[in-house]
Every structure is written in C-alpha cells, then in structure tokens.
Amino acid sequence: MIYPKTYDVIVVGGGHAGTEAALAAARMGAQTLLLTHNIETLGQMSCNPSIGGIGKGHLVRELDALGGAMALATDKSGIQFRRLNASKGAAVRATRAQADRILYKATIREMLENQENLDLFQQAVEDVTLDGERISGVVTAMGVEFKARAVVLTAGTFLSGKIHIGLENYEGGRAGDPAAKSLGGRLRELNLPQGRLKTGTPPRIDGRTIDFSQLTEQPGDTPVPVMSVRGSADMHPRQVSCWITHTNTQTHDIIRSGFDRSPMFTGKIEGVGPRYCPSIEDKINRFADKDSHQIFLEPEGLTTHEYYPNGISTSLPFDIQIALVRSMKGLENAHILRPGYAIEYDYFDPRNLKASLETKTIQGLFFAGQINGTTGYEEAAAQGLLAGANAVQYVREQDPLLLRREQAYLGVLVDDLITKGVNEPYRMFTSRAEYRLQLREDNADMRLTEDGYKIGLVGEAQWRMFNEKREAIEREIQRLKTTWYTPQKLAEDEQIRVFGQKLSREANLHDLLRRPNLDYAALMTLEGAMPSERLSAEVVEQVEIQVKYQGYIDRQNEEIDSRRDIETLKLPDGIDYGKVKGLSAEVQQKLNQHKPETVGQASRISGVTPAAVALLMVHLKRGFKDAK
C-alpha cells in the first residue's frame, strides 16, 4: 500500500545521525518521517558510553551551535564530565562526558516524540523508489510505500552487517538487531560505489565482580563542565568515577594464543578497521614491544552494574575474552555480561557525495553517518544534522548549508570525505584542521549559530541567548580598550603584585591582557578594573582568548582570505577533464574520477599540483570551451 501522507523528508535509521537529521528537518518546518526497525533503540549508544573528546567534542559543540540535540542530551544524562587538555592552548581544549546510556536514549526519545512536524514509524526499510534519477520514497518490510521528495539514509553498521566472535559469524546490524540485507542489496543495484569496513566493541563486565580497591580512580572535574549552551550543571545526574587498570605480559600472551582463531588474522574479516580505535589483538600485534596498555573501566549508567572496558575491543573467541579480562588487575574474578565482537558492514564511497551530502547520482538522496565511512557518534550526528537540513533546503529549492574548512570541523569532515574518500573508518582529530585556532570549542556558537538561525535550525530562545552573549563580549572588549592605567595611578606594590614589575608607561586593560603572564582574573583585582555587569564564565573565556590570540587569529584570517577565491570558485558540471589541455594524464584521471565541485576541493585531491590548479583557473575564465 501507499501511505496516505506524503512527506517532505524521510529519514531512514534512528541512530545518532538519523535522530539529528530528523530533528533538524522537523525544526526547519518540514514534514518529516523517521523510520526505524525498532523504536525502543532510538538514540542508542551502541558502543562506548561517552560523548566528546578531542576533535569529537568540537563537533558536539558545533552541533549544539546549530540547534542539535547531542550536547543537551549529554547534559541531561552525563554522569562524569572532564575538560581534556585544560592546561594546553585554547584550540585543543575539549569536553568529554560519560553518559548513562539509558538516560541518554530516553532523552533523545523524548526530544523526538515532542518535536513538531516529526512522525515516527517502526518498520525496517527494504527498498528505495525512484522517479527517473530522483528519489521518490521508500518501501518497508511489510510493503508500505512512503512518498517523499528527499530521503536521508543513516543505516549505520546495518547494511549487510556481519558479526564476528572468533571463527563464528552471523548476520546482524549490531548485537541483538538484524542486518539490513535487502536494503544493502538494493543500494548495490543502483551502482553506487561501495566497500566494506569493520568496527568492534569490547566485552561488558559486571561491576559487582570488579575489585575496585586494586584500581586507580579517575573522578570527573570540579567544577563540572557543561556541554550545551542551553544546558547547565543543574541538569546533570549524580556524578561517578571511572577506573583504570592495565594489560600485562600475561594478558598479551593470552591474546596471542588466540590469533589462530581470530577472524582478523585468519582472513574471515575483509573490512578495514579504525586505525585510531584498534582492537586489542591488533594493538598487541602492531605494538609487540609494549608490555602494557591502559584500560579505562567506564560505568554504563547509574541503574546498572555494567562497565565498559575502553581499550579491549575484540573479536577473539569467547574463551580467550574471559581469560584476557581475568588476567588484569582488579578483574581476576570478573563476570562478562556481553561478549565483545567485530562487525563488518557496507559503506558507500563519500566521493560520490556533494558537499551538501546529497548523492551525485540520485537527486534528493542524502547519506549521513557510518554509511559514509566515518566512525563515532559525534561524526555521525554532525553529518546527520547537515544532511537533514540540506534535505529541507533541497525540497524548498534553496541553497544548501555548506560549511567551509575554516568555519567548522564539520566543514573539515565533509570536505575530507568528499575529496579524499576513505580506506579506513574516518575519525575526527583537531590535527585534521588547518585553521584550528579558529575552530575552538568555546567559539562554536560565534561561528555557526547565525547561519543556523537563518535557515530555521536554531530557535528563538537560543538565538536570543547567543545575541546576549555576543553583545556582552563586544562590550567587555571595548571596556578593556577604554580603561587606562598610568604608573602614577597604581601603588608600586600593586603593580608588582599584578604585573610582576612596575608599569613603564600608560596602558589599557586590553593591552595588559595581551601579556603572556597575565590573565583576566588577575587583572580584575586591580582597583577599578571590574566590570559593572556580571559576566558569565563563557563570556570571560571568549574575551580572554580573543584578546590574547588576536595577533595569531589576524594572521590566519589573512591566509584564509588569500585562499577564499579558489575555495569557493565553482567548477561547472559535465566537464571532461581529459579534454582540458595542459593537465597531466594523472590529474585528468583524478579530476574525472572525483568530479570536484570547487577549485578548492580540486586542490586537495592527491596528485593535483598547484600548477594544475592555476591551469584550472585559466580554463575557468575561458569557460572550459573545449571540455564540455
């Protein structure tokens, strides 16, 4: 049957990408349908019970700046918060939280059920329908056809998923859930370029069988950090500690003894796993000289005894899993609640996507999350929001939301995917960004909220809070510039106390704050230095960073401006680069293969030289007359 209601946007999949995509589309006013094989698993944390971290936390803040759900849901479910790299430069400081997975899932479910313009339906999708080269809808397992002008696919690890434990394997999307075999087969029929990747998860441990007296405690930070600009510490549930243990030489010997039954070493697994989140057997094999690896025991929630041992993801046989866990300090009597496993799944080459995350071959079909070759909740959620928003822009025939590399980590993520593709699961790091001083956690709202508000992603309450913060920052910076001190105005002992030396000349607070040995709090102890209005910690942080890093930021802005022309310069559709005179055969081949949308994208394709970019600029001015 054909369902009687036609939707603007259909989202397939209810993980982190799918929920953000559906919420984004519905916030923008589009009639949206979220289809999931099981409503009870909406927003489920399939692997580790944590959100954020270096690079990943930056993405969460960007999601939040665009009205997304992940940061706020983390504030409502986070049971431990830490600020990573707190003593380092502002660019690499990041927030990480342990989340109660039951609370997190319940919070996302509540957001979905209370979102206007959003319908939910429980049924696996087995087919997509086309009208020529345009998407027209989807068909579920029981034959219901839902019509829509745009579809966002966020299938995660479910497409032709296969789970491995030792030499045993079976079809599945994750433990306890079926694979999307029919949908995976249908997408292959559409000749979308695809491949296989692998990820894994560790065994879960019953906390009642852990000897915590043998472990090192790792408490959260005080004061407790907050993830969302709409959140507060008052939202946080009870806070708890994580715990640290280590592998040892006995552990490593046990792991090696299982190599002959490992699906990874016996060739049972074909997909490539994540380089930066390797299995414990991969670590022992690659770093054979290391006698020990640190393992974090992370609580799964406040109402369960389950612990997640971060660092021992494995697909080794279950008897080896038991032995390796019990070989570690504090875990001698540990009971495993769930075995670790690896999962192989289909992904689709993201070089077949536009910067909007729409496929180049099927109009109105958008991909987000692990289907694009990424790994991680945060990477998936960020893509989901962008794909959901751009699906609405597509339906409305309006320009897509495109984020530049110097504007957002989400811009870096998408640009890396669509220009370079992936040969292993892609994870975000701050080192992937050329302009990371611009892309700090603390200024995500300053970079993105205005763009989000313009297209309806950001609500009025968040927009009002943003403007109040922005204006407070501007007022305080201006006040610092107009508050002057002379050597005669301050007592000599006060000058030495605050500045470490006597003032040699008149200076304002703005110039004094730029000194490397001075911070805002110390300056405010000067007589007459305190502002008349009470400033939030977030405003003070922004003021201090903007003032102290102004010279570096200005230099980066000059570099960005010098590249902006080539970054945004559009390349026409339908160019046969084989006919573009002067380009080498390698460059012609790679440009035809990747089909970049802009000169900036072309410049980042491996093998495309600066000389080739200059030649493209010349041909662009002439209109590529010979190449159409």
Curated annotation (Swiss-Prot):
Its main location: cytoplasm. Disulfide bonds: none annotated. NAD(+) binds at residues 273-287. GO terms for biological process: tRNA methylation; tRNA wobble uridine modification. Keywords: Cytoplasm, FAD, Flavoprotein, NAD, tRNA processing. FAD binds at residues 13-18. It is found in: Cytoplasm. It holds the Pfam family GIDA_C_1st. InterPro entries: FAD/NAD-bd_sf, GIDA_C_N, MnmG, MnmG-rel, MnmG-rel_CS, MnmG_C, MnmG_C_subdom, MnmG_C_subdom_sf. It comes from the Bacteria. One of its GO terms (molecular function) is flavin adenine dinucleotide binding. One of its GO terms (cellular component) is cytosol. The keyword Flavoprotein applies. Its cofactor is FAD. Belongs to the MnmG family. NAD-binding protein involved in the addition of a carboxymethylaminomethyl (cmnm) group at the wobble position (U34) of certain tRNAs, forming tRNA-cmnm(5)s(2)U34. This is tRNA uridine 5-carboxymethylaminomethyl modification enzyme MnmG. It comes from Neisseria meningitidis serogroup C / serotype 2a (strain ATCC 700532 / DSM 15464 / FAM18). The lineage of its organism: Bacteria, Pseudomonadati, Pseudomonadota, Betaproteobacteria, Neisseriales.
